[in-house]
């Protein structure tokens, strides 16, 4: 779990690295600052058109290490990990929700949200097919019902990899 200090460090790192990575053709998807197995770890998740490989992760690591050292925003010793966002890629920006329209997603709100669909009870979780981002809300089809979740109410949204569907397509 990320505390206030951890959020602050992650946000400082994001502001510092985002323009540099964009210049180099990468999208900074997410920054995580957490204590794992007794050590501080800074995780930087990147993406680019066509996907991210190990060479990209190594290149970004070599680019950001000196920037982080000079900026000195992180006091304790830490491990730096650079990777792709993975199959369960987080969705944050409005453009993310349009780019991944048609994909299966899981959306979690900060608290129960009422009125996301006509007659729907207040709820905190939705899993369905992403339709896109319209008028400040994320639209998704949950079992044939269109739900609109206000973007400012979303705590977390991720792509949800459909293993069974992928296996069926390969047969």
Swiss-Prot record:
<dbReference type="InterPro" id="IPR028998">
    <property type="entry name" value="RimP_C"/>
</dbReference>
<dbReference type="GO" id="GO:0006412">
    <property type="term" value="P:translation"/>
</dbReference>
<dbReference type="Pfam" id="PF17384">
    <property type="entry name" value="DUF150_C"/>
</dbReference>
<dbReference type="Pfam" id="PF02576">
    <property type="entry name" value="RimP_N"/>
</dbReference>
<dbReference type="GO" id="GO:0000028">
    <property type="term" value="P:ribosomal small subunit assembly"/>
</dbReference>
<comment type="similarity">
    <text>Belongs to the RimP family.</text>
</comment>
<keyword id="KW-0963">Cytoplasm</keyword>
<comment type="function">
    <text>Required for maturation of 30S ribosomal subunits.</text>
</comment>
<dbReference type="GO" id="GO:0005829">
    <property type="term" value="C:cytosol"/>
</dbReference>
<protein>
    <recommendedName>
        <fullName>Ribosome maturation factor RimP</fullName>
    </recommendedName>
</protein>
<dbReference type="InterPro" id="IPR035956">
    <property type="entry name" value="RimP_N_sf"/>
</dbReference>
<dbReference type="InterPro" id="IPR003728">
    <property type="entry name" value="Ribosome_maturation_RimP"/>
</dbReference>
<dbReference type="InterPro" id="IPR028989">
    <property type="entry name" value="RimP_N"/>
</dbReference>
<keyword id="KW-0690">Ribosome biogenesis</keyword>
<dbReference type="InterPro" id="IPR036847">
    <property type="entry name" value="RimP_C_sf"/>
</dbReference>
